[in-house]
Amino acid sequence: MYNDIIEFLDNKRLKEALVQLTALAHEADNWQLSSEIESLQTTYSYMLQYAAQGMEDPERNKLYHQLLRTAYELADRTEATRKYRTGTGYMHGKYYSFQQIPPHSYQEICLSLEAFSENLGMAQITVMDEERRSETVNKLYIEHEKYVTELFDIIWISTHWTDEDLSGANSILESLLVPANDVAVMISAVTLSLIQVFDSRKFQFLIKAYQTHSETIVVQRALIGIALTAYYQEKRLKLYPDLQAALSLSLIHI
């Protein structure tokens, strides 16, 4: 069904695509996606009504392309959600785990990652007994790894970022206290997620990481992510002129 939807969209047959997309959302059993698809259908119906009445709208072509782009996004997200819900394996397990117990927010994870270096330094200074110090340091590393793994997982299986998610992710990227290796792991998760489901906000994040971060490991990881996404999601990128412009600007400085 997903392939049929994409074929309809490629041929600019939005009405047929939306009918199939509604059925796909039913399989995914996700009320939020169903609501967004219904809203898209309503907007498209109004646009058709105004056109049938002969009403002039200089923004109609722009609106149509926005609707088309949104339909592609919803199709990708719905199919990914359906696979997570009905599939097997690690990602299926994580999807259900996060449905039962919501993960920490990006802001909460940022605070934990920032505290790691400080707590590690304090343990080295304040715990005099070597055995106790080793035990304390080991616990800190285990706790830190738990948060890094959670960060990787919530990004990897996310179908899209909200503005709030992007803001939280940028907090981690911009923090002077979060270790560069942690940010590099985060960027790897963003790249894997983008290869599966294109997300304009995640791609913006990669471009920002490449343009602004001071650590080589982060910049190189972001550049790899940009290149892989541009290759695997070439067709989706063409729907976003602003991202193409930002990408071209980034490539000038390579």
Locate predicted features.
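Alpha-helical linker/edge segments of TPR/alpha-solenoid repeat scaffolds
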Residues: 48-54, 231-240
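Extended, helix-rich scaffolding/adaptor regions
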Residues: 1-129, 142-143
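Short inter-helical turns and helix N-cap capping residues of alpha-solenoid HEAT/ARM repeat scaffolds
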Residues: 214-215
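Alpha-helical repeat scaffolds
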Residues: 204-205, 237-250
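Alpha-helical solenoid scaffolds in large eukaryotic transport, assembly, and signaling factors
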Residues: 116-183, 187-208, 234-235
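Conserved small/polar residues in nucleotide/adenosyl-binding loops
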Residues: 253-254
